């Protein structure tokens, strides 16, 4: 919406709050007088997406541009590192290098994993998060997380996978996590969440393998004074069956 002061100076409704309802030209108080002529001019404009330098080729009418940019699939991603609010943003190749070089996150090529988590004094860990590994699988990147937190008053551990890309593309993949010992095991299968979702949002939705602390310590064996968990898993791509139209798994070795 385009507004103007009593002297005819114009500015947009977004900027009105930034100038504290005062015209930046004449300092008169701004009302809600719309400049319809300028709005008509704005409606006729077609502008490219501001993320064109990242690959977006779309062109939009002026008033649709901001709405598109808020959801543009080429918009930069926030750093997915868990455990700190890292302010870095960028495309996927940049963030993979950033995670490796600045956060010292391990990177591996392959779609299967086998991790062992060892923590002394696990009863003292109420809120902790670890981004353990970034996997390069099927030409895409995935982040494996492991967290300790409370559900109500119950201490739990949780493992989950995030996809370094958009939500729609994440739906093409599935993953499994498994933990166990002494002839018992827990399993989880699901779809990785996009890194568009903050890791806390994923954690708080309980979208992953959740292990109660007493079960985790049972799996650890011994005197239950040390956490020793082995978590294995794999990632696969759901492919369309050309004959029956049914999704069949394509498992990367």
Residue ranges and their predicted role:
Residues 1-253:
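Signature of small Cys/His-rich zinc-finger-like modules used by ubiquitin/SUMO E3 ligases
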């Amino acid at each position: 919406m385009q507004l103007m002061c009593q002297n005819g100076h114009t500015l947009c409704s977004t900027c009105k709050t930034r100038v504290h309802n005062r015209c930046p030209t004449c300092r008169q108080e701004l009302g809600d007088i719309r400049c319809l002529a300028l709005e008509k001019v704005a409606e006729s404009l077609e502008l490219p997406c501001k993320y064109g330098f990242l690959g977006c080729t779309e062109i939009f009418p002026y008033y649709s541009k901001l709405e598109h940019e808020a959801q543009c699939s080429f918009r930069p991603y926030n750093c997915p590192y868990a455990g700190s609010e890292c302010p870095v943003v960028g495309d996927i190749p940049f963030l993979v290098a950033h995670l490796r070089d600045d956060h010292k996150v391990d990177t591996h090529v392959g779609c299967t994993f086998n991790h062992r988590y060892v923590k002394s004094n696990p009863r003292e860990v109420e809120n902790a998060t670890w981004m353990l590994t970034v996997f390069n699988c099927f030409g895409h990147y995935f982040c494996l997380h492991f967290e300790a937190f409370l559900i109500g008053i119950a201490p739990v551990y949780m493992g989950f996978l995030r996809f370094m890309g958009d939500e729609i593309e994440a739906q093409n993949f599935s993953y499994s996590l498994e933990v166990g010992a002494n002839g018992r095991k827990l399993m989880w299968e699901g779809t990785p969440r996009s890194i568009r979702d903050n890791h806390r949002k994923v954690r708080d939705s309980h979208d992953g393998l959740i292990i109660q602390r007493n079960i985790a310590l049972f799996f650890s064996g011994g005197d239950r004074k040390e956490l020793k968990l082995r978590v294995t898993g794999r990632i696969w791509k759901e492919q369309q069956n050309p004959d029956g139209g049914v999704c069949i798994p394509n498992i990367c070795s």
